[in-house]
A protein has these predicted regions:
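Residues forming the Rossmann-fold NAD(P)(H) cofactor-binding site
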Residues: 103
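C-terminal "cap" of GNAT-fold acetyltransferases
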Residues: 52, 60, 119-122, 126-133, ...
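Short coil/turn segments at alpha/beta junctions that flank glycine-rich nucleotide-binding fingerprints
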Residues: 99, 116-119
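Acetyl-CoA-dependent GNAT
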Residues: 7, 16-22, 26-95, 106-108, ...
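Short acidic N-proximal helix/loop "leader" segments that mark the beginning
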Residues: 1-7
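Residues that form or flank phosphate/diphosphate-binding pockets in enzymes
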Residues: 82, 100, 131
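Active-site acidic-Proline motif in GNAT/NAT acetyltransferases
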Residues: 92-95, 99, 127-128
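Extreme N-terminal starter segment of soluble prokaryotic enzymes
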Residues: 11-13
């Protein structure tokens, strides 16, 4: 990372998204997923309507610098559980990946959930993205099982989700 990138990282702020951010969120998610996930049949990962739907059931945390959206992550409180949250759609602008923004967003999401009194964070990782499972393991997530990949999403290769969980209060994942 050069000194300009270092200065920029100091000016990155994380905030909770509003409905008017939906178009920018859609753009950053589609850019990040398109760059990283070549096993999907070519199409956008998400559209503005889906982002708005997510915003009505959870929160997007945004990393931005001088009004430029650099990345986002989605957090949803699990209705069936009083102590669990779901994290998904972690996306960083392709030109900013490997800069620490993903970790910054993960830290912000975990802190947000801790502040709400939640004890566990759950995620689903596509098994074809082995490097992502490793990233989450380094952050304290452990595998808790597998689940089916949505049949309506076309893929070039068969795949499934690796279910992972992390205790937010120091307990073992369950």
């Amino acid at each position: 990372m050069n000194s300009a990138d270092s200065r920029e990282s100091k000016s990155v702020r994380v905030r909770i998204a509003q409905r008017e951010d939906a178009e920018k969120i859609t753009t950053v998610i589609n850019s990040a997923f398109r760059a990283a996930e070549g096993f999907f049949v070519e199409r956008d990962r998400i559209d503005v309507g889906e982002v708005l739907s997510f915003l009505s059931s959870g929160k997007f945390l945004l990393a931005e610098s001088e009004r430029s959206l650099l990345g986002c992550v989605y957090v949803e409180l699990r209705a069936a559980s009083q102590d669990r949250a779901y994290l998904g759609l972690l996306a960083v602008d392709p030109g900013r990946q490997q800069s620490g923004l993903g970790s910054m967003l993960m830290d912000a999401a975990e802190d947000y959930c801790r502040a709400l009194g939640l004890r566990f964070m759950d995620i689903k990782v596509v098994n074809l993205r082995e490097e992502l499972a490793g990233f989450y393991r380094k952050r304290g997530y452990v595998e808790t099982g597998t689940s089916a990949f949505p049949a309506e999403v076309e893929t070039k290769l068969p795949c499934h989700f690796i279910d992972m969980s992390k205790p937010l209060d120091g307990d073992k994942a369950t």
